[in-house]
């Protein structure tokens, strides 16, 4: 099968060859002074397991809120449409090792969470669609694979 080169970086990634969980640099965007680094934070194996939307939505809230307690370089935390992980955009932050440390600290915060940040109709577009227990399950599962986060292809 010949695969056409696409404009989107992740569409050029062979999802059959990656081994979740992992953290990798998915792209760079250089400005005049600064560099935006996009990270692929993969929780589940593509085309095998997807996180349920409610658990993923809760993880998004917890990750987006709590990771900023550890770094001012965070631009955005975005869920992947395939529901297997998140993209994190960082400013001038080009280190998978340091990113892994940030994610680890933040996932430990998820495990300790007793409430979901911004879970209300004023601050969230689907406030009733959350699952804290499910978010903790996937945080725990991701942390269990911590020693393998630097191994993208398996």
Curated annotation (Swiss-Prot):
It is an enzyme of class 4 (lyase). GO terms for biological process: quorum sensing. Fe cation binds at residues 57, 61, 124. Keywords: Autoinducer synthesis, Iron, Lyase, Metal-binding, Quorum sensing. Its cofactor is Fe cation. Pfam families: LuxS. Gene3D superfamilies: S-ribosylhomocysteinase (LuxS). Binds 1 Fe cation per subunit. Its EC number is 4.4.1.21. InterPro entries: LuxS_sf (IPR037005), Metalloenz_LuxS/M16 (IPR011249), S-ribosylhomocysteinase (IPR003815). It catalyses: S-(5-deoxy-D-ribos-5-yl)-L-homocysteine = (S)-4,5-dihydroxypentane-2,3-dione + L-homocysteine. It comes from the Bacteria. GO terms for molecular function: iron ion binding; S-ribosylhomocysteine lyase activity. Involved in the synthesis of autoinducer 2 (AI-2) which is secreted by bacteria and is used to communicate both the cell density and the metabolic potential of the environment. The regulation of gene expression in response to changes in cell density is called quorum sensing. Catalyzes the transformation of S-ribosylhomocysteine (RHC) to homocysteine (HC) and 4,5-dihydroxy-2,3-pentadione (DPD). Homodimer. HAMAP family: LuxS. PANTHER family: S-RIBOSYLHOMOCYSTEINE LYASE. Belongs to the LuxS family. This is S-ribosylhomocysteine lyase. The lineage of its organism: Bacteria, Bacillati, Bacillota, Bacilli, Bacillales.
